[in-house]
Regions:
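Bacterial Sec-dependent N-terminal signal peptides
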Residues: 9-37
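Active-site-adjacent "subsite" loops/lids of carbohydrate-active enzymes
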Residues: 125-131, 137-145, 216-283
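Short acidic catalytic loops
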Residues: 160-168, 274, 280-284
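Bacterial N-terminal signal peptides
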Residues: 1-10
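Beta-strand-enriched, solvent-exposed domains that form extended recognition/catalytic surfaces
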Residues: 32-126
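Loop/turn elements at helix/coil->beta-strand transitions in domains of secreted/extracellular proteins
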Residues: 129, 158-163, 208-215, 284
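An acidic-aromatic substrate-binding cleft motif
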Residues: 116-170
Length: 284
């Protein structure tokens, strides 16, 4: 139980004890409503963060009792307050950039504010200012639109605004499953696990509905054993010997698709090649 103490505001004397200017003035008391908590209402918002000017849609898991109120706080300041009912309502936050607010749902009982639910709101034009990272790493057939929406709703409740796709790609040097014009329905990741293109897309679509940013993981200096067939040149690699017979590599467990052979990330031709392969991903 949290109680807010009343503060007694008294006129103060100067350094010499003189109080002539306020002589005869009586002390004043600021009354503060006591507060307690009963966090029984689950709240959610429709996005992980909001650009200045965007409206926030709040949803309560169950219908709110009559007389329920919500106040919006910026640190110790209350910037808005209203009565709400039903299971959903809309709030227009102030347009100041890079501010975080607390929505505080409460009811009044015997002169006490009883907090029944809280949730934060991030108003930022650029999510990189306050990054909150999450990850997805399973792209099997069971990751349907419904399943990925449910998972991203959970991350959204934690205000995750960036989601990284870990080991989603076909090959480090050729991340897309298929080609720019013909996607594969299913392909194998580096550990020879099935990756469904539909599952990858389901995650991206669910994340974008919550305003999250999707980003894919890849190396800027790695290629697999069949890279020559995909256009990777021998002179782009890093070698362990002066005669350039043994490529440097990151060895992986047996049964995986390939070891990762190290490429010189400063090589301009390699950079151009990998940029083109990344563009294959973005156009799809």
């Amino acid at each position: 139980i949290y109680w807010v103490a009343a503060f007694l505001c008294m006129a103060c004397s100067d350094d010499h004890g003189s109080n002539q200017e306020n002589e005869g003035a009586s002390g004043s008391v600021t009354e503060v409503t006591p507060v307690t908590s009963d966090l029984s209402v689950d709240l959610s918002t429709d996005k992980a963060f909001y650009k200045p000017g965007e409206k926030v849609v709040f949803t309560a898991e169950d219908a709110l009792p009559a007389g329920t109120k919500v106040r919006y706080r910026l640190l110790g300041e209350v910037v808005g307050e209203e009565t709400v009912n039903g299971t959903s309502w809309i709030w227009q936050p102030p347009t100041t950039d890079f501010k975080g607010y607390m929505a505080e749902l409460y009811r009044q009982e015997n002169g006490t504010d009883v907090i029944v639910g809280t949730i934060a709101v991030d108003v930022s034009s650029d999510p990189a200012r306050f990054p909150r990272y999450g990850f997805v790493a399973d792209f099997s057939q069971e990751k349907t639109a419904e399943k990925t929406q449910e998972e991203m709703a959970y991350l959204n409740r934690h205000h995750i605004n960036w989601v990284q796709f870990q080991d989603w790609h076909n090959k480090h040097h050729w991340p897309l499953g298929g080609t720019r014009t013909q996607l594969d329905e299913v392909y194998m990741d580096i550990a020879n696990r099935e990756v469904y293109t539909s599952s990858v897309k389901n995650y991206i679509e669910a994340q974008h509905r919550f305003g999250m940013k999707s980003m894919f993981y890849n190396l800027c200096f790695g290629a697999l054993k069949d890279a020559a067939a995909d256009g990777v040149k021998e002179e782009w690699y890093l070698f362990k010997d002066a005669s350039h017979t043994t490529k440097d590599s990151h060895d992986l467990p047996g049964g995986w698709k390939s070891n990762i052979y190290l490429v010189d990330p400063s090589n301009k031709e390699w950079q151009k090649y990998l940029n083109e392969r990344n563009d294959d991903v973005y156009v799809n």
